[in-house]
Amino acid sequence: MFWTRYAGASILLFLMLIHLGQVYPRNDITNFGCEECKLKENNIFSKPGAPVYQCMGCCFSRAYPTPLRSKKTMLVPKNITSEATCCVAKEVKRVLVNDVKLVNHTDCHCSTCYYHKS
């Protein structure tokens, strides 16, 4: 009787895992909850007939061990080196909305994160 409970629970867990695998078949877990880098309308500054767009979304980032020869040249040696790209505007157009000068993004791409540089 004790073993049948374990077998029943194991089978139930196995069936739930199979169901989850079918519900979320080919989702990339690394981007889960974050859309690709693209233009989206800014609801705060947009008005009917004059939409304002901005770049939003995710790009890649990664971390890896710092190569020894690079570590030797660092003022403050770090064990981990990281790279990241951010969703930035490739092209922009300046617009005036309610006497406020704005930059309307017209094209987006993944590029260097400027706020990470020091």
Swiss-Prot record:
Glycans are attached at residues 79, 104. It holds the Pfam family Hormone_6. Disulfide bonds join 34-58, 37-87, 55-108, 59-110, 86-113. Coiled coil: none annotated. GO terms for biological process: G protein-coupled receptor signaling pathway; positive regulation of steroid biosynthetic process; regulation of signaling receptor activity; thyroid hormone generation. GO terms for cellular component: extracellular space; follicle-stimulating hormone complex. SUPFAM superfamilies: Cystine-knot cytokines. Its main location: secreted. One of its GO terms (molecular function) is follicle-stimulating hormone activity. It comes from the Eukaryota. Heterodimer. Glycoprotein hormones are heterodimers composed of a common alpha chain described here and a unique beta chain which confers their biological specificity to the different hormones. Shared alpha chain of heterodimeric glycoprotein hormones. These hormones bind specific receptors on target cells that in turn activate downstream signaling pathways. Involved in gametogenesis and steroidogenesis. PANTHER family: GLYCOPROTEIN HORMONE ALPHA CHAIN, GLYCOPROTEIN HORMONES ALPHA CHAIN. This is Glycoprotein hormones alpha chain. It comes from Hypophthalmichthys molitrix.
